Amino acid sequence: MNYMPGTASLIEDIDKKHLVLLRDGRTLIGFLRSIDQFANLVLHQTVERIHVGKKYGDIPRGIFVVRGENVVLLGEIDLEKESDTPLQQVSIEEILEEQRVQQQTRLEAEKLKVQTLKDRGLSIPRADTLDEY
């Protein structure tokens, strides 16, 4: 096989269905329509998939432009195996509510952890107070 360097290897994947994981944790699924030398992507018929436990929900997003530096993972979806998932699809409202509850639970657990460490004389700096320079 003759492999092309860099993002040129993605040319073969144009017009195929892909899953894209972003740095902020979002998961996008759509058809790859265009790429450039910086790995910027244009996805068509895109949905944002939200997973909570064994359930998932899809939020339609349409055409989606993704800046290359925000892509963590890009993978082609096998259309034959796509429907063979153990996950249950639920409505957008239901999955958003479950996601909110999950995030609230994580936040409360993090606060408890920080308080416990503080009581023992330890402290962990919060991520939002750190400089990213």
Swiss-Prot record:
Any idea where this protein resides? Cytoplasm; Cytoplasm, P-body
**What's a GO cellular component annotated to this UniProt protein?**
P-body
Q: Which of the residues bear the PTM Phosphoserine? A: 123
Q: Which InterPro entries does the record cross-reference, listed alphabetically?
A: Lsm1 (IPR034104), LSM_dom_sf (IPR010920), PTHR15588 (IPR044642), Sm (IPR047575), Sm_dom_euk/arc (IPR001163)
Residues modified as Phosphothreonine are 129
**Which UniProt keywords are present, listed alphabetically?**
Cytoplasm, mRNA processing, mRNA splicing, Phosphoprotein, Ribonucleoprotein, RNA-binding
Ranges for domain Sm: 5-80
Signal sequence annotation: none
Listed Pfam families: LSM
Q: Record's SUPFAM superfamilies?
A: Sm-like ribonucleoproteins (SSF50182)
Gene Ontology molecular function terms on file: RNA binding
Name any Gene Ontology BP term.
Answer: histone mRNA catabolic process
In which broad location class does this protein mainly occur, judging by the first location in its UniProt entry?
cytoplasm
Q: How does it assemble?
A: Interacts with SLBP; interaction with SLBP occurs when histone mRNA is being rapidly degraded during the S phase. LSm subunits form a heteromer with a donut shape.
Query: Which protein family is it in?
Result: Belongs to the snRNP Sm proteins family.
Q: Which function does this protein serve? A: Plays a role in the degradation of histone mRNAs, the only eukaryotic mRNAs that are not polyadenylated. Probably also part of an LSm subunits-containing complex involved in the general process of mRNA degradation.
Quote the protein name from its UniProt record.
U6 snRNA-associated Sm-like protein LSm1
